[in-house]
From Swiss-Prot:
The gene is PRP3. Coiled coil: none annotated. It is found in: Secreted. This is Placental prolactin-related protein 3. Residues 1-13 form the signal peptide. Disulfide bonds join 72-190, 207-213. Glycans are attached at residues 45, 67. It comes from the Eukaryota. The keyword Signal applies.
Length: 213
């Protein structure tokens, strides 16, 4: 709470949240948020590896690659895509978007690592990157929850009301190879898109604390 309050004060978005005394040194605060930004960068990098690995092996010149992100399970969240729009948001709202994306992708990544690792489409490279992403997503999620604990319930409520639920498992294990490949491509493409948003929101939180936005 102390950290999120300091950040909120810096952008003048929540004056009533500002305590009179901050217990955490600015240097420590800066280190924590820079580490969060590094985590989000790593998530993008591993997601990019997963996407390109599958794309090069299975998806070249395939019709299902067209408009694949139009049916991502997170589309109804309407998360901001433009940096300019995200920069106009206060830090509490940014933290909500971060948690919404992290929560929404936990199940598909978990199933990819635990239940789908024997699928031929899940190469060692993809599996290794997926495992790294699971670890880093859980670490980033824990950090955001600690600093912005007040948004956890509103985020869960929003996800519930928007009916954000990934239901692609049946297609991923389909006996029809075209159906299976289309589902894997959509999974990796949607994750790639959302990881870039996640990275942008986290980077904005970090650059605000270092005054480098």
């Amino acid at each position: 709470m102390v950290m999120s309050n300091l950040l909120l004060c810096q952008v003048n978005s929540c004056p009533s949240c500002c305590p009179d005394v901050f217990d955490i040194p600015l240097e420590s605060l800066t280190h924590l948020f820079l580490n969060a930004s590094r985590l989000s960068h790593d998530i993008v990098n591993h997601t990019t590896i997963m996407f390109h690995e599958f794309d090069e092996k299975y998806a070249q010149n395939q019709p299902y690659t067209i408009n694949a992100t139009k049916s991502c399970h997170t589309n109804s969240l309407h998360t901001p895509q433009e940096r300019e729009k995200a920069l106009r948001m206060n830090n509490e709202d940014l933290s909500k978007w971060i948690l919404m994306l992290l929560y929404s992708w936990h199940r598909p990544l978990y199933l990819l690592v635990k239940d789908l690792q024997s699928m031929k489409e899940v190469s060692d490279t993809i599996l290794s990157s997926a495992k790294e992403n699971m670890r880093k997503i859980e670490e980033l999620q824990a950090f955001i929850e600690r600093q912005f604990s007040q948004v956890i319930y509103p985020v869960i409520r929003t996800i519930f009301k928007a009916r954000i639920y990934w239901s692609g498992l049946a297609s991923l294990v389909s006996n029809d190879e075209d159906v299976r490949h289309s589902a894997f491509y959509k999974l990796f493409m949607c994750l790639y898109r959302d990881s870039r948003k996640l990275d942008m929101y986290t980077e904005i939180l970090a650059c605000r604390i270092t005054n480098t936005c």
